[in-house]
Design a protein with these regions (language model features):
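N-terminal secretory signal peptides
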Residues: 1-25, 34-45
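Bacterial signal peptide processing site
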Residues: 48-50
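Short, glycine-/small- and polar/acidic-enriched structural segments
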Residues: 54-210, 221, 225-231, 243-251
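Stable alpha-helical elements in mature extracytoplasmic
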Residues: 83, 92, 111-114, 132, ...
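Pocket-lining segment of extracytoplasmic ligand-binding domains
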Residues: 214-307
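Secondary-structure end/capping motifs
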Residues: 269-354
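Hinge/cleft segment of the Venus flytrap/periplasmic-binding protein
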Residues: 346-372
Length: 372
Protein backbone atom coordinates (compact mmCIF):
# COMPACT_ATOMS: atom_id res chain seq x y z
CA UNK A 1 0.00 0.00 0.00
CA UNK A 2 1.26 3.47 -0.88
CA UNK A 3 0.93 5.63 2.22
CA UNK A 4 0.74 9.41 1.88
CA UNK A 5 1.03 11.98 4.62
CA UNK A 6 -2.19 13.97 4.55
CA UNK A 7 -0.18 17.17 5.06
CA UNK A 8 1.97 16.45 1.99
CA UNK A 9 0.21 18.76 -0.43
CA UNK A 10 1.94 21.00 -2.91
CA UNK A 11 0.31 24.30 -3.83
CA UNK A 12 -1.10 23.91 -7.30
CA UNK A 13 -0.13 27.55 -7.85
CA UNK A 14 3.57 26.63 -7.92
CA UNK A 15 3.21 26.88 -11.67
CA UNK A 16 5.30 27.44 -14.75
CA UNK A 17 7.95 30.08 -14.22
CA UNK A 18 11.17 31.22 -15.82
CA UNK A 19 12.07 31.66 -19.45
CA UNK A 20 12.44 28.74 -21.85
CA UNK A 21 11.64 30.00 -25.32
CA UNK A 22 13.33 27.02 -26.95
CA UNK A 23 14.24 23.50 -25.97
CA UNK A 24 17.94 24.40 -26.32
CA UNK A 25 17.66 27.46 -24.06
CA UNK A 26 15.70 25.50 -21.52
CA UNK A 27 17.60 22.24 -21.24
CA UNK A 28 20.42 23.34 -18.93
CA UNK A 29 17.99 24.39 -16.21
CA UNK A 30 15.88 21.32 -16.78
CA UNK A 31 18.68 18.89 -16.01
CA UNK A 32 19.18 20.36 -12.56
CA UNK A 33 15.49 20.65 -11.85
CA UNK A 34 14.74 17.05 -12.72
CA UNK A 35 17.81 15.80 -10.89
CA UNK A 36 16.26 17.28 -7.76
CA UNK A 37 12.91 15.79 -8.73
CA UNK A 38 14.35 12.31 -9.13
CA UNK A 39 16.07 12.49 -5.77
CA UNK A 40 12.96 13.51 -3.87
CA UNK A 41 10.17 12.48 -6.20
CA UNK A 42 7.58 9.86 -5.38
CA UNK A 43 7.49 6.81 -7.62
CA UNK A 44 3.97 5.44 -7.56
CA UNK A 45 4.67 1.75 -7.34
CA UNK A 46 1.96 -0.21 -9.07
CA UNK A 47 0.56 2.76 -10.94
CA UNK A 48 2.63 1.59 -13.87
CA UNK A 49 4.08 -1.71 -14.94
CA UNK A 50 7.78 -1.02 -14.85
CA UNK A 51 10.07 -0.69 -11.81
CA UNK A 52 11.88 2.53 -10.97
CA UNK A 53 14.88 3.02 -13.19
CA UNK A 54 17.28 5.86 -13.75
CA UNK A 55 17.85 7.17 -17.21
CA UNK A 56 18.04 10.11 -19.54
CA UNK A 57 15.84 11.42 -22.28
CA UNK A 58 15.69 8.14 -24.12
CA UNK A 59 13.78 6.52 -21.25
CA UNK A 60 10.87 8.94 -21.48
CA UNK A 61 9.17 7.04 -24.26
CA UNK A 62 10.36 4.15 -26.37
CA UNK A 63 9.65 0.67 -27.64
CA UNK A 64 12.51 -0.96 -25.72
CA UNK A 65 10.57 -2.47 -22.82
CA UNK A 66 10.00 -5.80 -24.56
CA UNK A 67 8.62 -7.15 -27.78
CA UNK A 68 5.77 -4.91 -28.85
CA UNK A 69 5.77 -3.01 -25.55
CA UNK A 70 6.14 0.77 -25.44
CA UNK A 71 7.39 2.69 -22.40
CA UNK A 72 6.33 6.06 -21.05
CA UNK A 73 7.56 8.17 -18.14
CA UNK A 74 4.84 10.43 -16.77
CA UNK A 75 5.36 13.26 -14.28
CA UNK A 76 2.53 14.26 -11.95
CA UNK A 77 2.47 17.71 -10.35
CA UNK A 78 0.78 16.59 -7.13
CA UNK A 79 1.38 13.72 -4.69
CA UNK A 80 -0.95 10.70 -4.75
CA UNK A 81 -4.59 11.78 -4.55
CA UNK A 82 -7.98 11.00 -6.06
CA UNK A 83 -7.39 13.41 -8.90
CA UNK A 84 -5.42 10.59 -10.55
CA UNK A 85 -8.15 7.97 -10.15
CA UNK A 86 -8.22 7.04 -13.86
CA UNK A 87 -4.46 6.63 -14.02
CA UNK A 88 -4.47 4.47 -10.88
CA UNK A 89 -7.26 2.23 -12.16
CA UNK A 90 -5.43 1.91 -15.48
CA UNK A 91 -2.54 0.36 -13.56
CA UNK A 92 -4.57 -1.68 -11.08
CA UNK A 93 -6.84 -3.28 -13.67
CA UNK A 94 -4.24 -3.89 -16.37
CA UNK A 95 -5.26 -1.28 -18.94
CA UNK A 96 -1.63 -0.27 -19.49
CA UNK A 97 -0.61 -3.88 -20.09
CA UNK A 98 -3.58 -4.47 -22.38
CA UNK A 99 -2.54 -1.50 -24.52
CA UNK A 100 1.12 -2.52 -24.61
CA UNK A 101 2.59 0.32 -22.60
CA UNK A 102 4.89 0.14 -19.58
CA UNK A 103 4.43 3.22 -17.39
CA UNK A 104 6.77 4.83 -14.88
CA UNK A 105 5.37 7.70 -12.80
CA UNK A 106 7.28 10.42 -10.94
CA UNK A 107 5.97 13.31 -8.86
CA UNK A 108 7.31 16.86 -9.20
CA UNK A 109 6.77 19.84 -6.93
CA UNK A 110 4.44 21.71 -9.24
CA UNK A 111 4.22 22.31 -12.95
CA UNK A 112 7.55 24.05 -13.57
CA UNK A 113 9.84 21.04 -12.99
CA UNK A 114 7.27 18.73 -14.58
CA UNK A 115 7.22 20.75 -17.80
CA UNK A 116 11.00 21.02 -17.67
CA UNK A 117 11.24 17.24 -17.49
CA UNK A 118 8.98 16.93 -20.54
CA UNK A 119 11.00 19.43 -22.55
CA UNK A 120 14.34 17.87 -21.62
CA UNK A 121 13.13 14.46 -22.75
CA UNK A 122 13.42 12.95 -19.27
CA UNK A 123 9.64 12.49 -19.20
CA UNK A 124 7.25 11.91 -22.05
CA UNK A 125 4.22 13.73 -20.65
CA UNK A 126 2.81 15.57 -17.68
CA UNK A 127 -0.73 16.56 -16.75
CA UNK A 128 -1.27 20.20 -15.86
CA UNK A 129 -3.78 23.02 -16.21
CA UNK A 130 -4.96 24.26 -19.59
CA UNK A 131 -4.76 27.88 -18.48
CA UNK A 132 -1.20 27.58 -17.18
CA UNK A 133 -0.15 25.66 -20.32
CA UNK A 134 -1.45 28.43 -22.57
CA UNK A 135 0.22 31.15 -20.50
CA UNK A 136 3.53 29.27 -20.75
CA UNK A 137 3.12 28.97 -24.52
CA UNK A 138 2.09 32.59 -25.08
CA UNK A 139 4.36 34.37 -22.61
CA UNK A 140 7.44 32.18 -22.57
CA UNK A 141 7.29 30.39 -25.89
CA UNK A 142 7.26 27.00 -24.22
CA UNK A 143 7.46 24.40 -27.03
CA UNK A 144 4.81 22.14 -25.54
CA UNK A 145 1.78 20.52 -27.17
CA UNK A 146 -1.52 19.60 -25.55
CA UNK A 147 -2.17 16.01 -26.64
CA UNK A 148 -5.31 15.26 -24.61
CA UNK A 149 -7.90 17.05 -22.48
CA UNK A 150 -8.64 15.30 -19.20
CA UNK A 151 -10.94 17.44 -17.06
CA UNK A 152 -12.97 20.07 -18.91
CA UNK A 153 -14.05 22.41 -16.12
CA UNK A 154 -12.24 24.99 -14.01
CA UNK A 155 -11.19 23.06 -10.89
CA UNK A 156 -11.67 25.77 -8.26
CA UNK A 157 -14.41 27.27 -6.09
CA UNK A 158 -14.85 30.23 -3.75
CA UNK A 159 -16.14 29.30 -0.31
CA UNK A 160 -18.06 31.86 1.74
CA UNK A 161 -20.54 32.06 4.61
CA UNK A 162 -24.21 31.25 3.98
CA UNK A 163 -25.07 34.40 5.93
CA UNK A 164 -23.11 36.52 3.43
CA UNK A 165 -22.91 34.29 0.35
CA UNK A 166 -20.82 34.93 -2.73
CA UNK A 167 -22.80 33.20 -5.47
CA UNK A 168 -21.85 35.13 -8.62
CA UNK A 169 -18.85 37.20 -9.76
CA UNK A 170 -20.66 40.51 -9.24
CA UNK A 171 -20.86 39.67 -5.52
CA UNK A 172 -17.08 39.98 -5.29
CA UNK A 173 -17.01 43.77 -5.64
CA UNK A 174 -15.30 45.31 -2.65
CA UNK A 175 -14.87 41.92 -0.94
CA UNK A 176 -11.52 40.61 0.26
CA UNK A 177 -10.80 37.14 -1.13
CA UNK A 178 -8.17 34.68 0.06
CA UNK A 179 -5.88 33.05 -2.51
CA UNK A 180 -3.29 30.26 -2.01
CA UNK A 181 -0.47 32.26 -3.62
CA UNK A 182 0.20 35.40 -5.61
CA UNK A 183 0.44 35.21 -9.37
CA UNK A 184 -0.64 31.60 -9.76
CA UNK A 185 -3.59 29.93 -11.41
CA UNK A 186 -5.88 30.64 -8.45
CA UNK A 187 -5.31 34.38 -8.68
CA UNK A 188 -5.60 34.32 -12.48
CA UNK A 189 -8.90 32.44 -12.13
CA UNK A 190 -10.09 35.07 -9.66
CA UNK A 191 -9.21 37.77 -12.21
CA UNK A 192 -11.18 35.88 -14.87
CA UNK A 193 -14.18 35.71 -12.54
CA UNK A 194 -13.93 39.43 -11.92
CA UNK A 195 -13.66 40.22 -15.64
CA UNK A 196 -16.71 38.08 -16.42
CA UNK A 197 -18.88 40.53 -14.49
CA UNK A 198 -17.29 43.68 -15.91
CA UNK A 199 -15.40 44.51 -12.72
CA UNK A 200 -11.76 45.57 -12.44
CA UNK A 201 -9.14 43.66 -10.48
CA UNK A 202 -8.87 46.77 -8.30
CA UNK A 203 -12.47 46.18 -7.21
CA UNK A 204 -11.57 42.95 -5.40
CA UNK A 205 -8.77 43.01 -2.81
CA UNK A 206 -7.07 39.72 -2.07
CA UNK A 207 -4.60 38.23 0.39
CA UNK A 208 -2.64 35.00 0.60
CA UNK A 209 -4.27 32.48 2.94
CA UNK A 210 -4.63 28.77 3.49
CA UNK A 211 -7.32 26.69 1.82
CA UNK A 212 -8.41 24.27 4.55
CA UNK A 213 -11.59 24.24 6.67
CA UNK A 214 -9.60 25.97 9.41
CA UNK A 215 -9.16 29.00 7.14
CA UNK A 216 -12.93 29.55 7.36
CA UNK A 217 -12.34 31.20 10.74
CA UNK A 218 -11.02 34.21 8.81
CA UNK A 219 -14.44 34.46 7.18
CA UNK A 220 -16.22 34.13 10.52
CA UNK A 221 -14.06 36.91 11.97
CA UNK A 222 -14.83 39.20 9.02
CA UNK A 223 -11.26 39.34 7.76
CA UNK A 224 -12.24 37.66 4.48
CA UNK A 225 -15.47 37.47 2.51
CA UNK A 226 -14.35 34.14 1.07
CA UNK A 227 -11.35 32.22 -0.21
CA UNK A 228 -10.42 29.91 -3.06
CA UNK A 229 -10.35 26.13 -2.65
CA UNK A 230 -10.26 23.17 -4.99
CA UNK A 231 -13.75 22.31 -6.21
CA UNK A 232 -13.10 18.72 -5.16
CA UNK A 233 -12.85 19.99 -1.56
CA UNK A 234 -16.47 21.11 -1.40
CA UNK A 235 -17.78 17.95 0.26
CA UNK A 236 -15.02 18.11 2.85
CA UNK A 237 -16.09 21.67 3.65
CA UNK A 238 -19.77 20.74 3.76
CA UNK A 239 -18.98 18.22 6.48
CA UNK A 240 -16.49 20.30 8.45
CA UNK A 241 -18.10 23.74 8.02
CA UNK A 242 -21.92 23.53 7.80
CA UNK A 243 -22.13 27.31 7.33
CA UNK A 244 -20.11 27.16 4.10
CA UNK A 245 -21.52 27.83 0.64
CA UNK A 246 -19.74 27.77 -2.70
CA UNK A 247 -19.31 29.49 -6.05
CA UNK A 248 -17.72 26.93 -8.42
CA UNK A 249 -15.55 28.76 -10.93
CA UNK A 250 -16.50 26.37 -13.75
CA UNK A 251 -19.80 28.23 -14.09
CA UNK A 252 -17.91 31.31 -15.27
CA UNK A 253 -14.37 30.35 -16.38
CA UNK A 254 -13.14 28.21 -19.32
CA UNK A 255 -10.39 25.95 -18.04
CA UNK A 256 -9.50 22.32 -17.42
CA UNK A 257 -6.51 20.01 -17.49
CA UNK A 258 -4.48 18.54 -20.32
CA UNK A 259 -1.67 16.14 -20.96
CA UNK A 260 1.27 17.89 -22.58
CA UNK A 261 4.26 16.57 -24.50
CA UNK A 262 7.19 18.25 -26.22
CA UNK A 263 7.19 18.58 -29.99
CA UNK A 264 10.03 16.06 -30.19
CA UNK A 265 8.35 13.67 -27.77
CA UNK A 266 5.14 13.78 -29.78
CA UNK A 267 6.97 13.24 -33.07
CA UNK A 268 9.13 10.35 -31.88
CA UNK A 269 6.73 8.63 -29.48
CA UNK A 270 3.23 9.20 -30.82
CA UNK A 271 2.44 5.47 -30.60
CA UNK A 272 3.47 5.34 -26.93
CA UNK A 273 1.40 8.44 -26.16
CA UNK A 274 -1.64 7.02 -27.95
CA UNK A 275 -1.28 3.70 -26.15
CA UNK A 276 -1.03 5.42 -22.77
CA UNK A 277 -4.07 7.58 -23.49
CA UNK A 278 -6.06 4.57 -24.70
CA UNK A 279 -5.33 2.86 -21.38
CA UNK A 280 -6.41 5.88 -19.35
CA UNK A 281 -9.55 6.25 -21.46
CA UNK A 282 -10.44 2.62 -20.80
CA UNK A 283 -10.03 3.22 -17.08
CA UNK A 284 -12.17 6.36 -17.29
CA UNK A 285 -14.94 4.40 -18.98
CA UNK A 286 -14.79 1.81 -16.22
CA UNK A 287 -15.01 4.46 -13.49
CA UNK A 288 -17.93 6.11 -15.29
CA UNK A 289 -19.73 2.76 -15.44
CA UNK A 290 -19.22 2.44 -11.68
CA UNK A 291 -21.21 5.61 -10.96
CA UNK A 292 -24.48 3.77 -10.35
CA UNK A 293 -22.92 1.94 -7.39
CA UNK A 294 -21.55 5.16 -5.93
CA UNK A 295 -18.10 4.21 -7.26
CA UNK A 296 -17.97 1.35 -4.75
CA UNK A 297 -15.76 -0.89 -6.88
CA UNK A 298 -13.40 1.96 -7.74
CA UNK A 299 -13.02 3.05 -4.12
CA UNK A 300 -12.50 -0.54 -2.95
CA UNK A 301 -9.67 -1.08 -5.44
CA UNK A 302 -8.00 2.20 -4.55
CA UNK A 303 -8.18 1.51 -0.81
CA UNK A 304 -6.48 -1.84 -1.33
CA UNK A 305 -3.44 -0.06 -2.75
CA UNK A 306 -3.41 3.55 -1.53
CA UNK A 307 -3.87 5.35 1.76
CA UNK A 308 -4.35 9.03 0.95
CA UNK A 309 -6.65 11.05 3.20
CA UNK A 310 -9.68 11.58 0.96
CA UNK A 311 -10.13 7.81 0.54
CA UNK A 312 -10.86 7.44 4.26
CA UNK A 313 -14.13 9.39 4.07
CA UNK A 314 -16.76 7.68 1.91
CA UNK A 315 -18.76 10.83 1.13
CA UNK A 316 -15.65 12.85 0.30
CA UNK A 317 -14.29 10.09 -1.96
CA UNK A 318 -17.59 9.72 -3.84
CA UNK A 319 -17.97 13.48 -4.27
CA UNK A 320 -14.40 13.88 -5.51
CA UNK A 321 -14.70 11.08 -8.08
CA UNK A 322 -18.11 12.33 -9.20
CA UNK A 323 -16.70 15.81 -9.79
CA UNK A 324 -14.02 14.28 -11.99
CA UNK A 325 -16.47 12.09 -13.93
CA UNK A 326 -18.73 15.08 -14.59
CA UNK A 327 -15.71 17.06 -15.75
CA UNK A 328 -14.37 14.30 -18.00
CA UNK A 329 -17.75 13.93 -19.71
CA UNK A 330 -18.77 17.60 -19.98
CA UNK A 331 -18.64 17.38 -23.77
CA UNK A 332 -20.08 13.86 -23.90
CA UNK A 333 -18.75 10.37 -23.19
CA UNK A 334 -17.45 10.10 -26.74
CA UNK A 335 -15.05 13.00 -26.19
CA UNK A 336 -12.97 11.42 -23.42
CA UNK A 337 -9.36 12.64 -23.73
CA UNK A 338 -10.00 14.33 -27.08
CA UNK A 339 -8.63 17.82 -27.56
CA UNK A 340 -11.09 20.61 -28.34
CA UNK A 341 -9.90 23.57 -30.47
CA UNK A 342 -12.80 25.82 -29.46
CA UNK A 343 -12.19 25.34 -25.73
CA UNK A 344 -8.43 25.76 -26.18
CA UNK A 345 -8.89 29.05 -28.02
CA UNK A 346 -11.56 30.29 -25.59
CA UNK A 347 -9.27 29.77 -22.60
CA UNK A 348 -6.46 31.62 -24.36
CA UNK A 349 -8.70 34.50 -25.43
CA UNK A 350 -9.99 34.94 -21.88
CA UNK A 351 -6.43 35.01 -20.55
CA UNK A 352 -5.44 37.63 -23.12
CA UNK A 353 -8.43 39.77 -22.17
CA UNK A 354 -7.21 40.13 -18.58
CA UNK A 355 -3.57 40.44 -19.71
CA UNK A 356 -2.63 37.12 -18.11
CA UNK A 357 -1.24 35.98 -21.48
CA UNK A 358 0.40 37.82 -24.37
CA UNK A 359 -1.96 38.38 -27.28
CA UNK A 360 -1.39 37.64 -30.94
CA UNK A 361 0.05 34.16 -30.44
CA UNK A 362 -1.14 31.30 -32.65
CA UNK A 363 -1.69 28.81 -29.84
CA UNK A 364 -3.47 26.41 -32.19
CA UNK A 365 -0.01 25.28 -33.33
CA UNK A 366 0.43 23.81 -29.86
CA UNK A 367 -2.75 21.72 -29.91
CA UNK A 368 -2.52 18.15 -31.16
CA UNK A 369 -5.41 16.56 -33.05
CA UNK A 370 -7.15 13.86 -30.98
CA UNK A 371 -4.93 10.80 -30.52
CA UNK A 372 -7.59 8.44 -29.15
Amino acid sequence: MVKVNSEQRFDADALVGGQFSTRRAFIGRAAGAFAALSGGGVLLAGCGDSPATSGGGSSAGSSSSGAGTKSATIVNILPPQLGYVAEYIAGIDGFYKKNGVSVKVETARGSAPAIQAVLSGTALMCRCGRLESLIAIADRGAPIHAVAFTTRRSPLAIVSDKKAPLTKPADLKGKRIGIPSEGGTSETTLDLLIASSGLSTHDVPRQVTGFTPGTFQLVKKGRLAGFIIGATQMQQFRQAVPDATFMPTYNFVDDGENYIASARGLSENKDAIAAYLAAVRGAMQQVIADKESGYADTIRKLRAKYDFAELKNEAVAKSWIDFLVTSWTKDGDGQLLKTNPQEWQATYDAAVKIKAAKGGVDVMKNLSPPLV
